[in-house]
């Protein structure tokens, strides 16, 4: 396969040599030339920046319609659509100043428009914004996005929650393909490291039209790291220290781009000991380590743009059970998880005159090993001590649960020729997946899953009016093998299943501007989620959740219908946003205790009931003139989830109000990009709890942040310092899986990072 791809690239570079060029000059409204403005074409993975005369040049471009994005700090982002019909095209830009964050192109939605032009409201945050929060992991960092929370097991395991929905209801995309890593478990983490990404986009609400089954609750779309600008070499390395866990993270990066070819590689290694609560106790076995490596090669000419990406992620994560031995040891103790994910994606855009085809293929191999300590105790019951110790060593490295998940994805879309006001896309997506057991215990059976979906979507724009809609048909088949497992004088039987599910999804969205400055979006969408392998066929002890889980082969697909209204009012120095939603889910699947006991564990069974979730987010951003350096942010988020019988759904986030003061000083002598921030988080009491939950008290957290950059010659130094939970507040999150044991979340944490870029 690798040889074939290499031959293909070389052949294309030798045969297809003609090219188109775009040149231009970028100025501000005072006709001053701007240095360092980023000029980028997303579909080509190609970019450059302006020189001291404001001049830029992009060569080797296809004869097609392209979107050119121009972005510069302190100015409004501009995007122009241009049809290349001659070898040299001149395109000039005049940028207007803006005190708000740069508008950005949204990749996760089909027409790749600026956020301000998008019919669907999408939250976007950059890697730098996440890192400026001093987050221990990427799981921790996404909590800063309104409407997004995390179900946590210590600090090493985090499960994204979008507006109260999680697990297989939230789809994760990385490097352009869906990330499959047994995401049905609450103690199964995200599996993405921040060193491999450029930014994160969040679709809140059903996105089955775009992504099929499992996008019922929303999508986390991780955009991969960009290639270097044309004919540039970028090198970077950095180190971060975390005081609470006495942990560290080291990363490196390499990028090199030529006119047609481009390369990148980056990696990271992090290690943490048990985290410490406010009462000075360390939570035993919350230690973890993670190794990450990513590489990519890209090629483009006037007919095609391609990117081949590879990523490797391995995590070893302790499973906490109680507060025991107090130590800063980083070597893992039993029980723990050993997780490995390897991903390959091949992203292509083929230009066909007035239209284009995008085609992405991918392969993911996920291995999940769970090591338990019960074998350790059994080995000491009889026999010679030396022999027992040898056997114990063998047992420690023999996982109780071993799951091998192989996934093949494809996604092909035809972007039809555009007219002045109309764009349309038709496409097909699919997946083939196999699950194989290799451990002593079986929780879910060996299985094969096949998906196929066909979709069509279109947008009509005229003046301030934008109307977008689409329809999609999906089909999923699931076949499992029969297993008969002898365990403690009992037989656990996994009956073979042959199931199929189908669904039609649709969406309709409208965007306009009311009263000249209120951007209004109204979206109606339906989605679905077929029952996953765990929900249909579990039959065993799940040590990660300390319960015996029993599947239900009679489950139907979940279907939901959501309405979403978004209002944005913006002036030069003031911005306010209001988002409200109502989400009705038929046949909502959840796990419930049966009050029976099996193998010493309480039995939980998957059942269904209709449910509804509603709530929203409120945001305010004030930039008080003439205090151009000061920004005031306030965000409030809430969600309520109920079954049709009036009972509350479990694991629904508490209401939260976050207020931030941020001071930005672009230049102080040779120091640039200086900032100071103060954030006060007020999480309210959660007493809208499920039948088997208990209320959670309110709490307040105070966080500080500061950062600066210093440049000399071609070397740039970035330094960040964060003090999170500055008052060392003792608290327990409602979404913490350690709440039932009365174990607090992490206490005060000082985070210091230094990054060197050349």
What is the predicted function of each stretch?
Residues 4, 528, 584-587, 591, ...:
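C-terminal beta-signal and adjacent terminal beta-strands/loops
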């Amino acid at each position: 396969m690798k040889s074939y791809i290499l031959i293909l690239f070389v052949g294309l570079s030798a045969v297809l040599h003609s090219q188109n060029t775009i040149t231009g000059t970028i100025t501000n409204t005072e006709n001053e030339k701007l240095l360092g403005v980023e000029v980028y074409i997303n579909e080509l993975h190609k970019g450059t920046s302006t020189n001291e005369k404001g001049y830029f040049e992009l060569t080797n471009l296809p004869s097609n319609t392209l979107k050119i994005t121009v972005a510069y700090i302190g100015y409004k982002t501009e995007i122009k659509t241009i049809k290349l019909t001659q070898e040299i095209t001149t395109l000039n830009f005049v940028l207007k100043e803006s005190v708000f964050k740069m508008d950005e192109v949204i990749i996760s939605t089909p027409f790749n428009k600026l956020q301000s032009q998008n019919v669907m409201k999408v939250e976007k945050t950059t890697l730098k914004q996440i890192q400026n929060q001093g987050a221990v992991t990427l799981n921790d960092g996404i909590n800063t996005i309104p409407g997004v929370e995390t179900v946590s097991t210590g600090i090493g395991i985090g499960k994204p929650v979008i507006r109260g929905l999680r697990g297989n209801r939230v789809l994760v995309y990385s490097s352009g393909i869906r990330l499959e890593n047994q995401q049905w478990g609450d103690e199964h983490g995200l599996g993405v490291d921040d060193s491999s990404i450029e930014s994160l986009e969040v679709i809140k609400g059903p996105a089955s039209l775009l992504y099929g089954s499992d996008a019922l609750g929303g999508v986390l779309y991780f955009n991969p790291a960009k290639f270097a600008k044309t004919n540039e070499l970028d090198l970077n390395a950095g180190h971060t220290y975390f005081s609470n866990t006495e942990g560290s993270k080291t990363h490196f990066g390499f990028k090199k781009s030529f006119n047609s070819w481009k390369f990148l590689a980056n990696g990271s290694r992090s290690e943490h000991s048990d985290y410490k609560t406010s009462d000075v106790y360390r939570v035993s076995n919350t230690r973890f380590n993670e190794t990450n490596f990513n590489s990519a090669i890209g090629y483009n000419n006037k007919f095609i743009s391609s990117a081949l990406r590879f990523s490797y992620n391995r995590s070893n994560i302790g499973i906490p059970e109680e507060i025991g031995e107090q130590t800063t040891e980083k070597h893992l103790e039993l029980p723990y998880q050993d997780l490995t994910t390897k991903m390959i994606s091949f992203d292509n855009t083929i230009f066909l005159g007035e239209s284009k085809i995008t085609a992405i293929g991918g392969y993911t191999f996920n291995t999940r090993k769970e090591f338990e300590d019960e074998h350790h105790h059994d080995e000491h019951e009889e026999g010679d001590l030396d022999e027992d110790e040898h056997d114990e060593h063998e047992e420690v490295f023999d996982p109780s649960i071993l799951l091998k998940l192989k996934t093949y994805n494809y996604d092909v879309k035809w972007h039809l020729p555009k007219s002045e006001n109309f764009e349309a896309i038709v496409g097909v997506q699919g997946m083939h997946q196999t699950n194989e057991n290799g451990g002593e215990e079986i929780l879910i059976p060996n299985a094969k899953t096949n998906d196929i979906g066909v979709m069509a979507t279109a947008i009509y724009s005229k003046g301030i009016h934008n109307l977008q809609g689409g329809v999609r048909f999906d089909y999923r088949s699931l076949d499992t093998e029969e297993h008969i497992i002898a365990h403690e004088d009992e037989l656990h039987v996994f009956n073979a299943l042959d199931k199929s599910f189908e669904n039609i999804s649709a969406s309709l969205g409208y965007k306009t501007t009311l009263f000249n400055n209120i951007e209004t979006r109204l979206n109606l969408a339906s989605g679905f989620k077929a029952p996953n392998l765990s929900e249909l066929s579990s039959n065993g002890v799940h040590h990660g959740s300390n319960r015996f889980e029993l599947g239900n082969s009679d489950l139907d697909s979940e279907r939901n219908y959501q309405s979403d209204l978004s209002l944005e009012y913006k002036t030069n120095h003031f911005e306010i946003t209001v988002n409200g939603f109502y989400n009705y889910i038929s046949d909502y699947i959840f796990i419930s205790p049966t009050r029976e006991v099996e193998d010493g564990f309480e039995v939980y069974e998957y059942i269904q009931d209709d449910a509804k979730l509603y709530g929203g987010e409120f945001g305010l951003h004030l930039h008080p003139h003439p205090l151009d350096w000061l920004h005031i942010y306030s965000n409030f988020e809430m969600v309520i989830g109920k079954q049709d019988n009036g009972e509350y759904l479990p694991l629904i986030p508490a209401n939260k109000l976050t207020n931030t003061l941020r001071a930005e000083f672009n230049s102080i002598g040779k120091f640039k990009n200086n900032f100071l921030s103060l954030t006060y988080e007020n999480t309210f009491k959660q007493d809208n709890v499920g039948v088997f939950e208990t209320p959670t008290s309110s709490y307040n957290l105070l966080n500080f942040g500061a950062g600066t950059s210093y440049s000399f010659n071609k070397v740039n130094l970035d330094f960040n310092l964060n003090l999170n939970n500055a008052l060392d507040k003792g608290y327990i999150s409602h979404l913490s899986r350690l709440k039932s044991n009365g174990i607090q979340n992490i206490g005060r944490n000082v985070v210091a990072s230094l990054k060197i870029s050349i």
